[in-house]
From Swiss-Prot:
Binding-site list for Zn(2+): 481, 484, 500, 506
Extent of Polar residues compositional bias: 669-682
GO molecular-function term, one example from the UniProt record: metal ion binding
Upper lineage: Bacteria, Bacillati, Actinomycetota, Actinomycetes, Bifidobacteriales
GO cellular component, one term: cytosol
Organism expressing this protein natively: Bifidobacterium longum (strain NCC 2705)
Top-rank EC class of the record's enzyme: ligase
Protein name: DNA ligase
Length: 920
C-alpha cells in the first residue's frame, strides 16, 4: 500500500479477536512485516507497541501497522461507547492510541480525518467518502423466463466447448434482497467496508459495517488459512424477524415503519451516526470473492489455493464469515430448475426476502475463461421470479386531480404485503381501464408489482363474487371535479382522460402545481413540500362535515391494549370555526409571501388513537410504551407555519452578559457609521421586522429570550416563592418556514430552464426545458417564439413546441392567470436573468446518448441533464443515429436493441468517463 493512500476507519460492535497465546512474535524483527502480522489485540502486544520506535519503519510498513492498530482502537471504541462493554484494559487502549499518534506524527500521510485519533469521546460519524475498489465489483445480468435461463446455460456450455455428457459443476444461490458490500481484510484484519457504487468506486461505510455482529473484525481459523489480502463480497440484509421487531419499535416510538426489509437495511447502513446502525440488527452473507493475495512468505506459497466458488465458501466458514445456508451445488440444468421451483414455493419460509436465484459456474478457472461484458460476468446469471401476485379486497375507488387537471381513478385496497412492501393504493389510469379490467368496488382483486416495483391491480377474482353480488357496486367516473365542482370533460375528442377545465383556481390542481414548482426538477424549494403546499392553497382540506367530529382540544385518544375509545360528546354550544381563505389563489403570489402572511394559517389534523401499556425495561424499571393504532375520526386545527404559543425561556446570567456585549458592539458600530439593519438584518421572509406587529413587546422583557421574528401573544402570570412573575408567551415562524423562505429567496435567481419547468407547461420536462433555454437564451425570446422556432431546436418535438407556444399565448389574454403569474414572478426577480451558457466542457457536442435501466449515481432526469449540459442529445429511444447506450441495472429492450445495432454499450463508470472526456 502506498503511503499516500487514504483509508477510512470504522469500528466493530465489540466482537474483537479472542486473546490468543504468544504466536512467537519475539522471533521477528520489530517493525517487520512478519512482526506486524503476528501482533495480537492483547495487553502484552499493546506494551510492545508502546515501546516500539516507529521512526525506524519504512513508510509502507508504517501504513500496515497503522491499519492494524486503527482497527483494534475502533473496536475498543465501539465496545466502550456503543455497547457499554469494554473489552480492553485502559492501559492497552491508551498504548494503541499513543502508537497511532506517533505513527501519524512520523508519517503525516497517515493522518486523515477518519483516524481514531481525531475522534472525541463517543463522537462517531460517517462522511461516506468515495473509495476505489481494489478489483471491480460487477453486477449480474437478469433473466425473467426459463427460456432465457436455458439460453444462457447453453451459451456457457457452448463457449466452454463443454462435452454434453460431462456434468458442469455450478453453484445455485438464493438472491438476497439486500445491499451489496465489499469487505477488505488485510492480514486478517477488517480494513474497509465499501458499497458497490458504480462497481469501480464505492462509498466507505466502514464505521457502520463494524457494528454488524456477523461480520468479524478479525478473520479466524489457522494462520496458514488467512491471506495477506482478500476482498469478500456479500449482501447486507435484515431478517424478517428483525425487520418486524424494528417496525414495532418504530411504531412504539411514534415513527413511521419501514416499507420492507431492504429499505430498512439501506436506511440503517447509511446512517451518519453508527450508533444508530448498531441498534438495527443487520445481517450479512458472503457470496463472492474479489482480489485474493497470499503473499510470498505464506506457508502455502504464492499459488491460488482457491480453485472454485465452493472452496471460497469453505474458507469463509473457517474465517467466521457467514455464508447462506441455502446454497446448492448442481451439475445439470434440471437441478437448477428444481432449486428455482423449490424456492418459488417457499419464498416466504426462509429468514430473509429474496427476489430470485443466482446461478454461477463453480470453477474459478472456467469463470476467467468465460470473462465478462462491460458490466456483468458471463459465468453467472440471476433468474428473477415472475411478479408475486396476491389477493386483497378493493375497498373503494376514489379519484385524484393532477396538476394539469387530469382526473385519475385510484384503487383503495385493504393493505397487503406484496414483493417487499405494503400496498394500499394503486392507480387505475382512467375510467376505460376500470371497465376493461371488469372490477367492482368490494371485489377480491389480484395485485402484483410490475417489474417488482410498481403496484398494479390485475383484475377481479371472479369466483369470489358468488353470494356477494349485493355487496358489490360499479365505479362511475364523476361528472364534476371533486375538488372545485367544475364539469369534467376530455381535453379533445377521442381522449380517454377526462380533465378539470378550472385550471386557475381548482385547489387540487393548484396544490399539485405548487408541489411541482417546489420540486428538485424546478425551483428546488425543499421545505415547500406537500403539506405546506396544501396549507397555502387548500387549508380546509379534511375539514370535518359537522361539529360532531370537531374536537379542538383533543390531539390524541389514549386507550389500554384491546380497548375501544369512549364515545365523543361535543361541548354544548361548540361551533366549527369559519372557513379560511387560502393564502394563494394561484402561483402569482408565491414570491410576494411574507412570514406575517402565514401567521394565522391553520390546517386540520386527526387525533390519533394511541395504545399505552406498561413494560419492564432491561434495567428492571417500569416504562410506558405508546403505539399509534389508528385514527379517531376527531379533528382539530394546528398552526401550519408558525409555532404554537410557547412561554419564552428565561436567560441565564451568562446569556444576559453575552447579550449586553452584543448590544454594546452594535451601538459601537452605529457610532462608526454602520446601520443596525446591516448588523442584525430583517427576519427571513418579512418585508419589515415582525417586532412592529401588534402585541410585540420584547424590549419590555429583556431577561427573556424573545427572538427578533417572534410575536408576544399574551403574558402569563407565574407565581413563585419570590412573588408573581410575568412570562411572555410567544409565537414565531417555525424552523421549516424560515428555511422555506431562505430557499425561495435563492429560487428568485434560478436558472431559466428551472423557471420554464416551474410554469407547469404541459409535456415540458427538465431535459427539453434545458434545450429550449439554452437555444433561446431568455424568457422574452421564448415568449415570442413560434412552433417553427422551437422545433428547429434539436430534441424539441412538435407537441412540446405547441404546448409552449400556446401557454405563452395565453399569458397575453387579458385577465389570464398565467400572464398574472409570469408578470408577478418577473417583478419579484424570477426569470429575468438570461440563460447561462454551460461552464462544463462540451464533450458530447453532436453526440446522441440513450440511458436505460437504473444507475447508482444518477436519476433518470439527472443523467439526461448531464448529457445535455455537455452539449449532447439525450434521446429516449435507440436508433442507428444513437452513438452510445448507457446500461444500468434492470435494463430492458433498449439494451437488446443496442446490441442488435452494434451500438457501443457503456457501464456507469464508462458513462462518467464519457462525460469527462468525450471518449471511452
Amino acid at each position: 500500500m502506498s503511503t499516500n493512500e487514504q483509508l477510512a476507519w470504522d469500528f466493530d460492535d465489540g466482537d474483537v479477536a479472542e486473546v490468543r497465546p504468544d504466536t512467537g512474535i519475539a522471533r521477528f524483527a520489530p517493525g517487520s512485516e512478519q512482526w506486524i502480522a503476528a501482533l495480537q489485540p492483547t495487553d502484552d502486544d499493546a506494551i510492545r507497541l508502546d515501546r516500539f520506535d516507529v521512526n525506524t519503519m519504512t513508510a509502507e510498513a508504517a501504513a500496515r501497522l497503522w491499519a492494524r492498530v486503527a482497527a483494534w482502537v475502533e473496536s475498543d471504541q465501539i465496545a466502550y461507547y456503543i455497547d457499554d462493554s469494554p473489552v480492553s484494559s485502559d492501559a492497552a487502549y491508551d498504548a494503541r492510541m499513543r502508537c497511532l499518534e506517533r505513527l501519524e506524527a512520523a508519517f503525516p500521510s497517515l493522518d486523515n480525518p477518519q483516524s481514531p485519533t481525531h475522534r472525541v469521546g463517543g463522537s462517531f460519524s460517517n462522511d461516506f467518502a468515495s473509495v476505489r475498489h481494489p478489483s471491480r465489483m460487477m453486477s449480474l445480468d437478469d433473466v425473467f423466463s426459463i427460456e432465457e435461463l436455458k439460453d444462457w446455460y447453453d451459451s456457457v456450455i457452448r463457449d466452454l466447448d463443454w462435452p454434453e455428457s460431462k456434468p458442469l459443476p455450478m453453484s445455485c444461490e438464493v438472491k438476497i434482497d439486500g445491499l451489496a458490500l465489499n469487505l477488505i481484510y488485510r492480514n486478517g484484519v477488517l480494513e474497509q467496508g465499501l458499497t458497490r457504487g458504480d462497481g469501480v468506486t464505492g462509498e466507505d461505510i466502514t464505521l457502520n459495517v463494524r457494528t454488524i455482529g456477523s461480520i468479524p473484525a478479525n478473520l479466524g481459523g489457522p494462520k496458514e488459512d488467512v491471506p495477506d489480502f482478500v476482498e469478500i463480497r456479500g449482501e447486507v440484509f435484515m431478517r424478517w424477524d428483525d425487520f418486524h421487531t424494528l417496525n414495532n419499535e418504530q411504531e412504539d416510538a411514534g415513527r413511521a415503519p419501514f416499507a420492507n426489509p431492504r429499505n430498512a437495511a439501506a436506511g440503517s447502513l447509511r446512517q451518519k451516526d453508527p450508533r444508530i446502525t448498531a441498534t438495527r440488527r443487520l445481517s450479512f452473507y458472503a457470496h463472492g470473492l474479489g482480489q485474493l493475495t497470499w503473499g510470498p512468505d505464506h506457508p502455502r506459497g504464492t499459488h491460488d489455493v482457491v480453485a472454485d466458488q465452493s472452496q471460497a465458501y469453505d474458507l469463509y466458514t473457517k474465517w467466521g464469515v457467514p455464508v447462506s445456508p441455502h446454497n446448492r451445488a448442481v451439475t445439470s440444468f434440471q437441478e437448477i430448475l428444481d432449486m428455482i421451483e423449490y424456492y418459488g414455493e417457499h419464498r416466504g419460509d426462509i429468514e430473509h426476502a429474496l427476489d430470485g436465484i443466482v446461478v454461477k459456474v463453480d470453477d474459478l478457472g472456467l469463470q476467467r475463461t468465460l470473462g465478462a461484458t462491460s458490466r456483468a460476468p458471463r459465468w453467472a446469471i440471476a433468474y428473477k421470479y415472475p411478479p408475486e401476485e396476491v389477493n386483497t379486497e378493493l375497498l373503494n375507488i376514489t379519484v385524484q386531480v393532477g396538476r394539469t387537471g387530469r382526473v385519475t381513478p385510484v384503487a383503495v385496497l385493504k393493505p397487503v404485503y406484496v414483493a417487499g412492501s405494503t400496498v394500499a393504493r394503486t392507480t387505475l389510469h382512467n375510467g376505460f381501464e376500470v371497465k376493461r379490467k371488469g372490477i367492482l368496488i368490494g371485489d377480491t382483486v389480484v395485485v402484483r408489482k410490475a417489474g417488482d416495483v410498481i403496484p398494479e391491480l390485475v383484475g377481479p377474482v371472479l369466483e369470489r363474487r358468488k353470494g356477494r353480488e349485493d355487496q358489490l357496486r360499479e365505479f362511475v367516473m364523476p361528472e364534476f371535479c371533486p375538488s372545485c365542482g367544475a364539469k369534467l370533460s376530455p381535453a379533445k375528442e377521442g381522449d380517454k382522460d377526462i380533465r378539470c377545465p378550472n385550471v386557475e383556481s381548482c385547489p387540487a390542481q393548484l396544490t399539485e402545481r405548487v408541489i411541482s414548482l417546489a420540486s428538485r426538477k424546478a425551483f428546488d424549494i425543499e421545505h415547500l413540500g406537500e403539506q405546506s403546499a396544501i396549507a397555502l392553497t387548500n387549508p380546509e382540506e379534511n375539514r370535518p362535515d359537522s361539529v360532531a367530529t370537531y374536537a379542538p382540544n383533543i390531539t390524541e385518544v389514549l386507550v389500554a391494549p384491546g380497548e375501544e375509545p369512549d364515545p365523543y360528546e361535543p361541548v354544548e354550544g361548540l361551533e366549527l370555526p369559519a372557513a379560511q381563505k387560502p393564502v394563494l389563489s394561484n402561483e402569482s403570489g408565491l414570491f410576494n409571501l411574507t412570514a406575517a402572511d402565514l401567521r394565522d394559517v391553520r390546517v386540520w389534523r386527526e387525533a390519533a388513537i394511541v395504545e399505552v401499556h406498561e413494560t419492564v425495561g432491561a434495567n428492571g424499571k417500569k416504562k410506558k410504551v405508546r403505539k399509534r393504532v389508528g385514527g379517531s375520526g376527531l379533528w382539530h386545527q394546528v398552526p401550519a407555519f408558525w409555532t404554537a404559543p410557547t412561554p419564552a425561556k428565561k436567560l441565564t446570567a451568562k446569556q444576559l452578559a453575552e447579550r449586553a456585549q452584543g448590544e454594546a458592539a452594535i451601538e459601537s458600530a452605529e457610532t462608526q457609521g454602520d446601520t443596525a439593519s446591516e448588523t442584525t438584518g430583517a427576519p427571513t421572509g418579512a418585508e419589515a421586522p415582525l417586532g412592529t406587529m401588534p402585541g410585540f413587546a420584547a424590549a419590555s422583557y429583556p431577561e427573556y429570550d424573545v427572538p427578533a421574528d417572534a410575536v408576544i401573544v399574551r403574558v402569563d402570570h407565574k407565581t413563585t416563592r419570590t412573588g408573581v412573575t410575568d412570562v411572555p408567551v410567544i409565537i414565531r415562524p417555525g424552523e421549516n418556514t424560515r428555511k422555506m423562505f431562505d430557499e425561495m429567496d435563492k429560487a428568485r435567481h434560478a436558472d431559466l430552464w428551472r423557471v420554464l419547468v416551474a410554469l407547469s407547461i404541459r409535456r415540458l420536462g427538465p431535459p427539453t426545458a434545458r434545450l429550449i433555454a439554452s437555444a433561446m437564451g431568455s424568457l422574452a425570446a421564448i415568449e415570442n417564439a413560434t412552433i417553427e422556432d422551437l422545433t428547429a431546436i434539436d430534441g424539441v418535438g412538435p407537441e412540446i413546441a405547441e404546448s409552449v407556444v400556446n401557454w405563452f399565448a395565453a399569458t397575453r389574454e387579458p385577465g389570464d392567470w398565467r400572464g398574472a403569474t409570469l408578470r408577478a414572478w418577473q417583478a419579484a426577480g424570477v426569470g429575468v436573468d438570461e440563460a447561462e451558457t454551460s461552464s462544463l466542457p462540451q464533450t458530447l457536442a453532436g453526440k446522441t446518448v440513450v440511458v436505460t435501466g437504473s444507475l447508482e449515481g444518477y436519476s433518470r432526469d439527472s443523467a439526461k441533464e448531464a448529457i445535455i449540459e455537455r452539449g449532447g442529445k439525450a434521446a429516449g429511444s435507440v436508433s442507428k443515429k444513437t452513438d452510445y447506450v448507457v446500461i444500468g441495472a434492470n435494463a430492458g429492450s433498449k439494451a437488446a436493441k443496442a446490441e442488435e445495432l452494434g451500438i457501443p454499450m457503456l457501464s456507469e463508470t464508462q458513462f462518467a468517463q464519457l462525460l469527462a472526456t468525450g471518449t471511452i
